[in-house]
C-alpha cells in the first residue's frame, strides 16, 4: 500500500498504477481561451476589417483616407471583484487600440491610441461578474465545419440509399452533392432546396470540353466480363486504345459498342478505361434535357443559364451577373467561409483522395505520392475540392463503411468562452464599419481628423453586455460548493445558439459513444430532458488549437512502456490499439500477459502484447472530476453513479467540514482548482495568522529570508473571506490551516474554503451507519438519525440570504427610510438605528407570539393628496409637512425566516450614480441563518443512495455496538440490492477500518481496494477491540451483532455496520415548508396566489373538487369555491364573523363567475343573469 502526504494529512492508497502525469489544471480550458482572445483574438478581428477606407478616385488621382488597427491592449480593471459584487457593478476593463490613419493621396500617416470602451473581463476564478452577480460562460459542443459523407434517410421502403457529400461552412449557403442509386444520377443540392444536375456545376469550374470533365471520373472495365460490358454499352471510352501492332482501335471519346467489344477481344485487350457509370448517366440525362447531340459540348454560357434559371427563376439572365452570383455563392471567402478549422478537417479528409487523383489522373508514381498531403489554403471552396469530393462519393457505394458518423467526436468541436465572445464581438464590430467609413469620408485633411471621435463602438459594448446577460451559454454560476463551481466551468453543452434543440435531439446524440473515451464523461449528465446533451469534460481531457477534444496516452514499444505521452483527437485514436493501464506490468514496464484486450476502432479485441501501440494514462481517464470522487465506482450501477455525481454538486458546506475516511485521491486536486482554497504564491515562513489575514515572509531558493534594499522584509499578505454569500445563499468562509513559524511551499494550501478540510474537498461527514430496518422509519429510502448528530452540529450549515428595498420617487413625493414608522411600537423598532436600518448583530425572525414580523429597514411612503380628509387638511395647515400622512412600507423578515444580521449595504443615488429609474436609495441587508438537521432534510451518499430524514431518535434508543457505541444513522438494507450500488457497502466496511486504525484511505476509481483487501484486515482489528461478535473468522463479512437501544436485546441477525460519508443536500425542508392563513390575491380572478415566494395558498384543483363531489360534502365544497377562494365580499364577512365569534354568513358570488361572464361579453355575447323570480341581477353589484 502506497502512502502520500497532503498538507498535514497522510493517505494510504490502494492504487497500483503509477501515474506519470499529474492531474492537469482543471480550469485551464476557460483561462487559456480567454487569454488567447485578449492576446491575439481581438487584434485578429480588428485586423480582419482593416483597412477601413473612404478612398475614391477623382480624375486620375485617388483621394480619401485608410484607417487600420495596428495594436491592441487591455487596461487595468476599473473596480475590484469584491467592489463590483457589493455595488452591483460589472467587472470591466478598458480596451485600447492603436489606430493608424493614412492619407491615400500623400501617403502621410497619423497614429494614435484610442479607447474602444469598457468590456467585461474574466476574474482570477474564471468567472464574469455581471451587475454584481458571478456568471460562467459554458463551452459549447457543435458540429465542426468541413465535408461530411452521410446516407440520407429515405421514406420509401425497399428503396436504394441516397449518399450525400455535405459541405458545412461556418458562414454561407450549404452545398450538397447527392448520389441517388435509384435513378443512378448525381445532383448538386443548393441550400437544401434547389436541385441541379451535377454536370452543370462541373461545367462552371472552367473546363472547355465535356470529355475533360468525364476523364476526371474514370472506371475500368474487364473485357472478358460479359455482364459488365452489357450494362455499360453506349458508355464513353476515356483513352485511345491501341493494339499490340500499333493500330488505333478506338479514339478517346468514342462510344463502346458490341462490335468494338469483339474487336477488343480479338486483339487480346483485357481492360479499358471508361467514364464512371453514374457520371455518364448524369451527363446523358442533362444532354436529353437540353436536347443536345452526344458529340456537342455543353458551353459554359449554357451551364450558367440553366443554373440561373433554377436558382433565380423569373429574372432576366445576364452572363456576367450569373457568373458573379454563382462564384460569390461558394468561391468567395466573404460569402462562403469554411474557417481555419473547416479547411483543416477538409484537407485531412481529402488527402487520400488527392493521392489517388495524382496517380490516376496526373499519372504520378504511387511511391512518390505516399507522403504528399492535400494542403489547400483557401477558406472558400475550390474546383479541386469539389472534384475530389465527387470522386470520394462515387466510392461510397462499394465502401459504405467509409461514411461519417455524425455522433463521432472527430466531427464535433468545442466553442470555448474566448471564441464565443470573439464571434459576438466580430458580429457587432462588422456593423460599426459602415459608420466609421461614413465619418471618415466627411474629412478632407489628415490634421482635422479626430481619431477618438471616429471609433465609437457603443453598439459593440451593448452587444457584449447583452451576450452576458441573456445568452443561454452565459449562466448564473452554480456555487453551492466548490465542486459545483468547478464542474460548471468544465461543462460542455450541445444546446444553445447554433446547437441542438432539446425537443428534437435524437437518442443517438444523447447516447455514450466510443469516441467519448477520455474526452467526455459517460456518467455525469443531468437526469431530465437534457440527459446526454449537457456533459462534463473528463479529468485529463483538453482542447487542441482547432477546438477538438484530445486525451493523453502513453506509448508502448515492443510491449514495453515508454515515457512518451501523446495527445490524440478522436479520429487519430482510431488507428491505434490502446490497452487499459490496469493490465499487469513488471518492474521494467514490460507487459506480463501474452494476449492483451485493447480498444481498436469501435471494438475490444485481444492482440499479442507486441501489437499494443498505446496505453491509458490513468484509470480515472474516462470519467469527470465529480465522478472520480466516488470510491468503488467500479462496483456501482451507472445510473446510480450518475445520481451520485449530480448530488455531490448539491451538498451544502457544513460548519465543521470533514474530509472522507475513504477517498479516491482526487479530493486534493478538486479543492485546489476550485479557487476556494488559498494557495501560497511563493515559498516562505508564516509570520502572522488570524481569522482574516495571513502574512508570509518570503524565502529564496537557499531557504534564506528575503528583504528589500531598505532592509524591510518582503512579505505576501492574504486576506481571507468571511461569511460571503454565494449565488445559492450558502456561506463562503475561509479559515487558516497554517501556524506561525510554519514553512510553506509555493502552491501549497494555507487556508481552507467552504467544504474543504486541510486542502482536501470535504462535502459531508463520516458517520457511523447500520443497514437495518427499524420500526418502518426507514421504509422507502427514509433515514433514521440519532440526536447525537444535532448535539454535535454534524450537519448544521450556515446560509446567508439578502433582502433589499428601495426608496423611490413617487408622484406624491419621495419615499423615506426612517425609524419613525406610524403605528409601530418601540419594541418593534428597538433594533433599528437612527436612520431606520437594522443594526449588525441583531437576531431577527424569532416570534414568541403572533406579532408582526421584525422590521429590517423602516420605510414610509407618502399617501396621495386625494385621499386626505378635511380634518387631515386642517392638521397639515397647522403643523405643516410634519402632519403629512404616510403609510408603512417597511422591509420585514419573511415568514419562517430567522437569523442574525451580518451586513448592511446602503447605496445613495448621489454617491453611486444610477440605481435604476426613480430610485434614490438602495438598502441590502444580509442575514445569516443557522440550519441544523431536521426531519424532511435530504441526505445522500456518494453512490446515488439518497433519502429523507424521517425521525430524529434520542441516542440512547439507537441500536448500539458490543462496546456500547450507538450508531448515528440507520439505513434500509433494501436500498442496496435492487439499486446495484454495492460501492456503499464496501465504503462502509473500509470506513470502519479507517476509523478503528485512525487512518485515511484512498481507493482510486477502477484501481481501488478489493473485498479481500478490506474484510480480513477489518476482522483482525475488530477482534483486538472485542467488536468481532456476529462475524465469521474464516469468511468475514463485516457484520456485527447489534443490540436494540430501547430493550437492550440483540437483533435476530448480525448487521452491517461502518462509517459512510454522508452529505446534506441543498433541498432543506425548512426552505420548502410553507403555510398561509390570509395573503395576497390575484388581481383579475381574485384567487389566492400560488407558491411560497408569493406567500400563496394550496390550489384546490378540479380533481380535488371531484373528490368532494364524490363524498357529497356540499358545504365544504361550497366554502372551497367561494369564501375560501374568490368571493371577495363573502371572505371579508367570514373573517369579521370569525373575529367576533358570530355565525358564518351565506357565501356570495365568486369572482370567477364574473370573470367568465366578462369573457363571454368580450366575445360579443350578451349574457344576462336572472334570479328564481325572473328578475335580472346586476352581478357587478354582488
From Swiss-Prot:
CDD domains: RNA_pol_B_RPB2 (cd00653). Keywords: DNA-directed RNA polymerase, Nucleotidyltransferase, Transcription, Transferase. GO terms for biological process: DNA-templated transcription. Transmembrane segments: none annotated. The RNAP catalytic core consists of 2 alpha, 1 beta, 1 beta' and 1 omega subunit. When a sigma factor is associated with the core the holoenzyme is formed, which can initiate transcription. Belongs to the RNA polymerase beta chain family. DNA-dependent RNA polymerase catalyzes the transcription of DNA into RNA using the four ribonucleoside triphosphates as substrates. This is DNA-directed RNA polymerase subunit beta. The lineage of its organism: Bacteria, Thermotogati, Thermotogota, Thermotogae, Thermotogales.
Amino acid at each position: 500500500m502506497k502512502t502520500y502526504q497532503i498538507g498535514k494529512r497522510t493517505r494510504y492508497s490502494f492504487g497500483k498504477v503509477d501515474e506519470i502525469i499529474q492531474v492537469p489544471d482543471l480550469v485551464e480550458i476557460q483561462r487559456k481561451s480567454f487569454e488567447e482572445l485578449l492576446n491575439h483574438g481581438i487584434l485578429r478581428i480588428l485586423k480582419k476589417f482593416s483597412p477601413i477606407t473612404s478612398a475614391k478616385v477623382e480624375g486620375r488621382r485617388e483621394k480619401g483616407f485608410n484607417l487600420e488597427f495596428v495594436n491592441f491592449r487591455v487596461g487595468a480593471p476599473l473596480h475590484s471583484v469584491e467592489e463590483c459584487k457589493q455595488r452591483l457593478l460589472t467587472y470591466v476593463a478598458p480596451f485600447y487600440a492603436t489606430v493608424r490613419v493614412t492619407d491615400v493621396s500623400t501617403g502621410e500617416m497619423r497614429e494614435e491610441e484610442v479607447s474602444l470602451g469598457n468590456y467585461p473581463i474574466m476574474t482570477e476564478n474564471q468567472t464574469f461578474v455581471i451587475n454584481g452577480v458571478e456568471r460562467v460562460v459554458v463551452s459549447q459542443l457543435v458540429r465542426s465545419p468541413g465535408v461530411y459523407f452521410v446516407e440520407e434517410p429515405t421514406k420509401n421502403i425497399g428503396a436504394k440509399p441516397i449518399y450525400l457529400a455535405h459541405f458545412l461552412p461556418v458562414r454561407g449557403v450549404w452545398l450538397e452533392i447527392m448520389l441517388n442509386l435509384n435513378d443512378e444520377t448525381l445532383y448538386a443540392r443548393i441550400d437544401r432546396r434547389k436541385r441541379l444536375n451535377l454536370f452543370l456545376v462541373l461545367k462552371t469550374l472552367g473546363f472547355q470540353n465535356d470529355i475533360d470533365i468525364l476523364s476526371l471520373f474514370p472506371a475500368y472495365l474487364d473485357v472478358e466480363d460479359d455482364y459488365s460490358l452489357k450494362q455499360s454499352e453506349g458508355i464513353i471510352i476515356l483513352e485511345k486504345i491501341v493494339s499490340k501492332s500499333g493500330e488505333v482501335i478506338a479514339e478517346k471519346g468514342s462510344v463502346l459498342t458490341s462490335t468494338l467489344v469483339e474487336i477488343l477481344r480479338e486483339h487480346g485487350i483485357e481492360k479499358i478505361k471508361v467514364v464512371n457509370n453514374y457520371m455518364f448517366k448524369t451527363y446523358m440525362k442533362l444532354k436529353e434535357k437540353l436536347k443536345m447531340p452526344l458529340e456537342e459540348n455543353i458551353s459554359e454560357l449554357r451551364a450558367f443559364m440553366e443554373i440561373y434559371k433554377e436558382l433565380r427563376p423569373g429574372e432576366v439572365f445576364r452572363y456576367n451577373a450569373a457568373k458573379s452570383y454563382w462564384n460569390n455563392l461558394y468561391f468567395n471567402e466573404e460569402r462562403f467561409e469554411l474557417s481555419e478549422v473547416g479547411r483543416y478537417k477538409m484537407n485531412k479528409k481529402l488527402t487520400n483522395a488527392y493521392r489517388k487523383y495524382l496517380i490516376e489522373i496526373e499519372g504520378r508514381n504511387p511511391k512518390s505520392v505516399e507522403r504528399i498531403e492535400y494542403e489547400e489554403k483557401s477558406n472558400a471552396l475550390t474546383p479541386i475540392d469539389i472534384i475530389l469530393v465527387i470522386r470520394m462519393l462515387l466510392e461510397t457505394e462499394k465502401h459504405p463503411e467509409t461514411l461519417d458518423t455524425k455522433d463521432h467526436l472527430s466531427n464535433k468541436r468545442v466553442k470555448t468562452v474566448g471564441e464565443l465572445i470573439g464571434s459576438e464581438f466580430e458580429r457587432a464590430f462588422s456593423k460599426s464599419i459602415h459608420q466609421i467609413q461614413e465619418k471618415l469620408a466627411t474629412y478632407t485633411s489628415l490634421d482635422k481628423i479626430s481619431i477618438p471621435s471616429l471609433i465609437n463602438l457603443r453598439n459593440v459594448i451593448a452587444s457584449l453586455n447583452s451576450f452576458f446577460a441573456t445568452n443561454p451559454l452565459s449562466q448564473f454560476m452554480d456555487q453551492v460548493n466548490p465542486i459545483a463551481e468547478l464542474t460548471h466551468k468544465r461543462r460542455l453543452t450541445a444546446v444553445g445558439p447554433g446547437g441542438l434543440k432539446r425537443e428534437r435531439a435524437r437518442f443517438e446524440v444523447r447516447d455514450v459513444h466510443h469516441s467519448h473515451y477520455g474526452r467526455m464523461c459517460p456518467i455525469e449528465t443531468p437526469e431530465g430532458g437534457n440527459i446526454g446533451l449537457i456533459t462534463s469534460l473528463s479529468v485529463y481531457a483538453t482542447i487542441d488549437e482547432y477546438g477538438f477534444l484530445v486525451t493523453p496516452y502513453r506509448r508502448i514499444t515492443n510491449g514495453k512502456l515508454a515515457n512518451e505521452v501523446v495527445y490524440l483527437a478522436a479520429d487519430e485514436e482510431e488507428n491505434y490499439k490502446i490497452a487499459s493501464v490496469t493490465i499487469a506490468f513488471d518492474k521494467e514496464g514490460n507487459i506480463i500477459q501474452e494476449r492483451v484486450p485493447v480498444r481498436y476502432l469501435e471494438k475490444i479485441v485481444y492482440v499479442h502484447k507486441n501489437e499494443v501501440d498505446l496505453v491509458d494514462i490513468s484509470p480515472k481517464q474516462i470519467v469527470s472530476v465529480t465522478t472520480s470522487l466516488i470510491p468503488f465506482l467500479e462496483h456501482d450501477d451507472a445510473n446510480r453513479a450518475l445520481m451520485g455525481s449530480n448530488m455531490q454538486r448539491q451538498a451544502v458546506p457544513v460548519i465543521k467540514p470533514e474530509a472522507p475516511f475513504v477517498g479516491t485521491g482526487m479530493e486534493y486536486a478538486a479543492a485546489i482548482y476550485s479557487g476556494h482554497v488559498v494557495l501560497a504564491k511563493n515559498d516562505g515562513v508564516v509570520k502572522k495568522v488570524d481569522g482574516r489575514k495571513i502574512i508570509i515572509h518570503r524565502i529564496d531558493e537557499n531557504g534564506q529570508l528575503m528583504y528589500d534594499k531598505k532592509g524591510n522584509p518582503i512579505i505576501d499578505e492574504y486576506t481571507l473571506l468571511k461569511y460571503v454569500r454565494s449565488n445559492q445563499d450558502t456561506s463562503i468562509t475561509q479559515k487558516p490551516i497554517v501556524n506561525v513559524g510554519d514553512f510553506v511551499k509555493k502552491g501549497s494550501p494555507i487556508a481552507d474554503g467552504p467544504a474543504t478540510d486541510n486542502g482536501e474537498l470535504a462535502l459531508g461527514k463520516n458517520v457511523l451507519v447500520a443497514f437495518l430496518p427499524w420500526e418502518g422509519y426507514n421504509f422507502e429510502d427514509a433515514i433514521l438519525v440519532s440526536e447525537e448528530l444535532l448535539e454535535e452540529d454534524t450537519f448544521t450549515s450556515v446560509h446567508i440570504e439578502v433582502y433589499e428595498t428601495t426608496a423611490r420617487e413617487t408622484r406624491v413625493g419621495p419615499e423615506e427610510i426612517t425609524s419613525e414608522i406610524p403605528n409601530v411600537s418601540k419594541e418593534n423598532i428597538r433594533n433599528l438605528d437612527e436612520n431606520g436600518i437594522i443594526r449588525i448583530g441583531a437576531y431577527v425572525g424569532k416570534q414568541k407570539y403572533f406579532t408582526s414580523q421584525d422590521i429590517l429597514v423602516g420605510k414610509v411612503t407618502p399617501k396621495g393628496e386625494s385621499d386626505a380628509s378635511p380634518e387631515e387638511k386642517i392638521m397639515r395647515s397647522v403643523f405643516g409637512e410634519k402632519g403629512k400622512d404616510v403609510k408603512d412600507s417597511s422591509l420585514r423578515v419573511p415568514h419562517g425566516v430567522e437569523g442574525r444580521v451580518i451586513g448592511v449595504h446602503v447605496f445613495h443615488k448621489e454617491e453611486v450614480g444610477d440605481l435604476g429609474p426613480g430610485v434614490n436609495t438602495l438598502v441590502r441587508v444580509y442575514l445569516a441563518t443557522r440550519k441544523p438537521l431536521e426531519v424532511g432534510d435530504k441526505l445522500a451518499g456518494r453512490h446515488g443512495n439518497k433519502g429523507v430524514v424521517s425521525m430524529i431518535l434520542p441516542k440512547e434508543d439507537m441500536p448500539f455496538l458490543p462496546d456500547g457505541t450507538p450508531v448515528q444513522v440507520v439505513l434500509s438494507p433494501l436500498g442496496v440490492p435492487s439499486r446495484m450500488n454495492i460501492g456503499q457497502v464496501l465504503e462502509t466496511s473500509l470506513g470502519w477500518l479507517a476509523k478503528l486504525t485512525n487512518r485515511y484511505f484512498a481507493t482510486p476509481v477502477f484501481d481501488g481496494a478489493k473485498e479481500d483487501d478490506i474484510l480480513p484486515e477489518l476482522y483482525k482489528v475488530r477482534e483486538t477491540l472485542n467488536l468481532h461478535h456476529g462475524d465469521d473468522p474464516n469468511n468475514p463479512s463485516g457484520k456485527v451483532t447489534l443490540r436494540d437501544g430501547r430493550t437492550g436485546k440483540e437483533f435476530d441477525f448480525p448487521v452491517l455496520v461502518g462509517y459512510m460519508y454522508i452529505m446534506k443536500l441543498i433541498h432543506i425542508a425548512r426552505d420548502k415548508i410553507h403555510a398561509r392563513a390570509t395573503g395576497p390575491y390575484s388581481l383579475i380572478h381574485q384567487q389566492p396566489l400560488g407558491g411560497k415566494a408569493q406567500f400563496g395558498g394550496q390550489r384546490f384543483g378540479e380533481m380535488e373538487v371531484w373528490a368532494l363531489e364524490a363524498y357529497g360534502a356540499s358545504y365544504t365544497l361550497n366554502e372551497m369555491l367561494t369564501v375560501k377562494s374568490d368571493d371577495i365580499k363573502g371572505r371579508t364577512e367570514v373573517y369579521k364573523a370569525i373575529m367576533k365569534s358570530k355565525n358564518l354568513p351565506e357565501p356570495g358570488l365568486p369572482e370567477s363567475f364574473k370573470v367568465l361572464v366578462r369573457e363571454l361579453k368580450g366575445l360579443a355575447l350578451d349574457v344576462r343573469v336572472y334570479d328564481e323570480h325572473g328578475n335580472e341581477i346586476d352581478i357587478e353589484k354582488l
